[in-house]
Regions:
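Canonical RRM/RBD RNA-binding surface and closely related RRM-like beta-sheet modules
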Residues: 1-41, 47-58, 66, 79, ...
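Conserved short beta-strand edge segments in small beta-sheet-based binding/regulatory domains
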Residues: 64-78, 158-177
């Protein structure tokens, strides 16, 4: 989906927060305002056609509209079509990570991710933090090249689940947009 007339300062969190309940998001990209445009635009790709159709139907309905940060945005089908992938599967843009709380916390993980790949953050939730264990839920802007890259980087850098590893488990979590 192609979304126009977004607030100039739109964030991934506010954009994706307005898409809740539509379906798993595969990728999101925000284009900030540029020469001749005062508003931002975004591309949102869903994992499956049904989610894209549900979102497009909602956004096209004059009685509902698609509102982000108080502005009515215009949603159109993207001219570049994407094939459905992982239909009915468990891949998402959300990771749930458990492990040593010295590593599994907001500051350490976001700093570490920043050294491995570029990412956009929707939400970071600390589910548990004790002296012995940290558990967090990281909602990236996209599965493609963000949540997927984070999972691979963690698996390649740490012996996940092995004795002595600071990362005990990494799994895909529920996408709040689904």
């Amino acid at each position: 989906m192609w979304i126009k007339h977004l607030p100039a300062n739109v964030t991934y969190s506010s954009l994706l927060g307005s898409i809740r309940g539509m379906g798993r998001v595969f990728a999101t990209h925000i284009n900030p305002p540029n020469e001749g445009h005062k508003t931002a635009a975004a591309k949102v790709v869903f994992f499956d056609l049904e989610a894209a159709q549900r979102f497009y139907s909602m956004a096209s309905n004059p009685s509902r509209r698609f509102i982000v940060q108080g502005m009515v945005a215009e949603v159109t089908r993207n001219r570049i079509r994407s094939a459905a992938c992982d239909v009915g599967g468990n891949l998402t843009r959300v990771l749930v990570i458990r492990g040593d709380p010295r590593i599994v916390n907001r500051d350490s993980l976001l700093r570490w991710f920043g050294t491995k790949f570029q990412f956009d953050l929707d939400e970071f939730t600390t589910m548990m933090h004790t002296e012995e264990m940290g558990e967090v839920r990281v909602a990236f802007g996209s599965y493609r090249s963000q949540a997927q890259a984070a999972q691979l980087a963690l698996i390649r850098s740490f012996p996940v689940g092995q004795p002595g590893s600071p990362i005990w488990s990494v799994r895909f979590g529920h996408d709040p947009c689904s």
